[in-house]
């Protein structure tokens, strides 16, 4: 049974069959032809995987992100960020990163950030003398902050799969997200120096910052409301998603008056398309995981890993490597839904903190989103600038290396992840 499930899945994936179909067909083949259970199990298990209150946050934050991009909120956020860091060498790259950090507090999606805030900024960077490769690299890597700083769609998925408190989990992403953002800014500074990018005129003054703050306060209030209400325990991340949708419509349509009916229809259509793809993957992965568990695959993995080592740090590093490698070839939500039910109990068994584990996995998945051959963010950014992944990837390597340095710091000092949770407790 295990051999059938693994071989059939990877053959279908290699043939270009969509990930949800590959998972579903492999699992159904095991049920129908190998006596893996009743056919009623197919619908039951798929519905069980998707039937989660926490997962309702996915379409809500996706819709909020699209309304933000179309409602003038993104542009004002970027103008405000420019007034703060635009004077630094490589200023537009820093604006790109800082905008992504703020946008992360609204959308929870890396791809939405790439196509939205950062995507809007790329033509301006090229016009100001930044190479296309540098522009695409910093845009792609900065968008990964969108899944680290709360609210985070992958963390919501992890919480739903593993039964972890969503509020505590998303809080754990605050310091790691800021740390990764600062690391990206440092790399951007030295790469801008290396490329000889012209420095933006002027220097830091408080006047433009105050003006930018006045112009963008409704936009800045949005992530403060979302993260603040979650942090204080007033609402759950899913309920905060409803607030994000309502506030995004209000700010874009009433305050800024830039959100049109056509934009709302576009946001609805894209949300349905994006969320539908995610949920069908989650449902199919749930069915596939149940079949693997029934066949004893989880016990074999646990026996193999624990036979190698029982040291928590070693097991943690092995788990992170598994997620990094798999995310290079599979969509991130599918990776989480497939591997978390198998690897999470092993991590708990050796004493790894579930919040630390989940946040680190999220950061590693972010790296996978910009790593070929299936890194979705890098492909979206390359498509927007009409360059190839092969041309951009060498420029992206220093950013990936900086992210791994941040991961190493978090493994060595897990308090960086747990501090916000301790403070709120």
Question: Where does each model-flagged region fall?
Answer:
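Alpha-helical transmembrane segments of multi-pass membrane transport proteins
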Residues: 1-425
């Amino acid at each position: 049974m295990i051999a059938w499930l693994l071989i059939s899945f990877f053959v279908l994936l290699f043939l270009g069959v969509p990930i949800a179909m590959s998972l579903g067909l492999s699992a159904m083949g095991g049920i129908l032809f190998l006596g893996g259970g009743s056919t009623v199990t197919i619908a039951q298990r798929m519905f069980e995987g998707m039937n989660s209150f926490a997962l309702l946050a996915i379409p809500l934050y996706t819709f909020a992100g699209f309304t933000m991009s179309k409602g003038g909120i993104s542009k004002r956020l970027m103008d405000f960020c420019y007034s703060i860091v635009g004077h630094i060498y490589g200023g537009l790259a820093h604006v790109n990163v800082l905008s992504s950090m703020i946008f992360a507090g609204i959308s929870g999606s890396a791809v939405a950030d790439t196509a939205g805030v950062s995507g809007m900024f790329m033509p301006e960077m090229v016009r100001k003398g930044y190479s296309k490769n540098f522009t695409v690299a910093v845009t792609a890597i900065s968008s990964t902050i969108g899944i680290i700083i709360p609210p985070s769609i992958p963390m919501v998925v992890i919480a739903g799969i593993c039964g972890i408190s969503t509020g505590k989990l998303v809080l754990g992403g605050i310091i790691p997200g800021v740390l990764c953002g600062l690391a990206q800014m440092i790399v951007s500074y030295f790469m801008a120096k290396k490329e000889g990018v012209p420095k933006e005129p002027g220097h830091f003054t408080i006047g433009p910052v105050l003006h930018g703050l006045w112009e963008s306060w409704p936009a800045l209030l949005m992530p403060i409301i979302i993260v603040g209400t979650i942090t204080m325990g007033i609402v759950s991340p899913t309920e905060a998603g409803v607030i994000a949708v309502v506030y995004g419509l209000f700010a874009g349509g009433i305050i800024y008056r830039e959100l049109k009916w056509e934009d709302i229809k576009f946001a609805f259509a894209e949300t349905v398309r994006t969320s539908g793809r995610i949920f069908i993957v989650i449902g199919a992965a749930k069915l596939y995981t149940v079949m693997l568990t029934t066949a004893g695959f989880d016990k074999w993995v646990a026996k193999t890993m624990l036979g190698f080592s029982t040291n928590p740090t070693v097991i943690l590093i092995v788990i992170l490597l598994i997620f990094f490698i798999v995310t290079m070839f599979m969509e991130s939500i599918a990776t989480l839904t497939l591997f978390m039910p198998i690897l999470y109990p092993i991590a708990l068994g050796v004493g790894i903190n579930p919040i630390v584990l989940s946040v680190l996995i999220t950061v590693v998945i972010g790296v996978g989103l910009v790593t070929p051959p299936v890194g979705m963010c890098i492909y979206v950014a390359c498509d927007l600038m009409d360059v190839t992944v092969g041309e951009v990837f060498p420029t992206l390597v220093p950013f990936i290396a900086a992210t791994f340095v941040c991961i190493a710091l978090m493994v060595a000092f897990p308090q960086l992840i747990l501090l916000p949770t301790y403070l709120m407790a």
